[in-house]
Amino acid sequence: MPPQEWTAAMAAHQSSLGRFLEAARAIPVAEWEIPLAPGKWSPAQQVEHVRLVYEVLGRELAGGQGLVIRTKWWQRAVLRFKILPGILAHGKIPARAPAPREARPGSGPFEREPLLAATLAAGTAVQRSLHERKDTPGAAVTHHIFGRLTLPQIVRFGTVHNDHHTRQLQRS
């Protein structure tokens, strides 16, 4: 990816994290722990999920365990060909896409300000790690459905993921 495109992708990702946190801060305190709909996560759980995703990505970028791939090789091949390009191009995650087990939030409660601060810190740390590795040949991270994604792919997917959860919070 040319440097200008990388810079733009990273800026878009940082902006998406800011929009997500802004949407989370706009949730009234009284609604912070209330599920958005029956069987859905609360705003607090949405934020905890995003924080956990960043935590797992950061761990993998530091050389530790990332997400566990939950699809068979042939499923990954089909999904990478049929679904992933649309997500990256159009910025929409399919409805009812499963969250990775490693990033499913507990039931809470979650203290609002410390969680928002931790999410910003985790997102910023991952962005820094991605930038440090951008010129590393073969650098990639693991997605639980699509398998190994290149750094430009994961930056874009992260932007789409943040925007996905921003829209969910704004509908509350």
What is each residue range found by the language model?
Residues 5-6, 12-13, 19-20, 24-45, ...:
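Long, hydrophobic N-terminal alpha-helical segment
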Residues 22-31, 93-102, 134-141:
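Short alpha-helical hairpin
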Residues 1-8, 56-119, 140:
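Short, helix-capping/interhelical loops that line the mouth of catalytic, cofactor-
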Residues 33-88, 124, 128-172:
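Short, contiguous alpha-helical
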Residues 4-6, 18-19, 127-129, 138:
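N-terminal start-of-chain detector that recognizes signal peptides
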